[in-house]
Structures are given as structure tokens and as C-alpha cells.
């Protein structure tokens, strides 16, 4: 779990907030929260995963044809 600790001598809220946001983004908390916001049936998850794989494959094929 990301956390930022402040010293009493070096109290700069803006810098601490920036560091915290960076840690949260690096940990992937926001994307995980958006993904879990609504229940998704396993069949829907499989369909999305399969569609993403197909999209990656088509992109790879297009890239190979361009080169």
C-alpha cells in the first residue's frame, strides 16, 4: 500500500501529494478500482480477453506487412 511520510522540517504538501499520486499510479490501484467497480461475469471477461488478443494479433500482422 502506497504511503508518504512527512518530516516536520520538510513539510511541503504539494511534493508529498505528487509523490503519493506517483506511487498509487505505479501500484495500479486506480486501474484496479475501475476494473472492480462493477461486477463482470466470467464469460464477459473471457470475451474481452479474446477480443484483446485478436486486436493485438491484427496489429502485429499489420505492422509486419508495413515493414
Curated annotation (Swiss-Prot):
Family matches, as Gene3D superfamilies: Ribosomal protein S8
PROSITE patterns tied to this protein: RIBOSOMAL_S21
Stored InterPro entries: Ribosomal_bS21, Ribosomal_bS21_CS, Ribosomal_bS21_sf
GO cellular component, one term: ribosome
Keywords: Ribonucleoprotein, Ribosomal protein
MF annotations from Gene Ontology: structural constituent of ribosome
PANTHER family: MITOCHONDRIAL 28S RIBOSOMAL PROTEIN S21 (PTHR21109), SMALL RIBOSOMAL SUBUNIT PROTEIN BS21 (PTHR21109:SF22)
Protein name: Small ribosomal subunit protein bS21
Species name: Nitratidesulfovibrio vulgaris (strain DP4)
Lineage of the organism: Bacteria, Pseudomonadati, Thermodesulfobacteriota, Desulfovibrionia, Desulfovibrionales
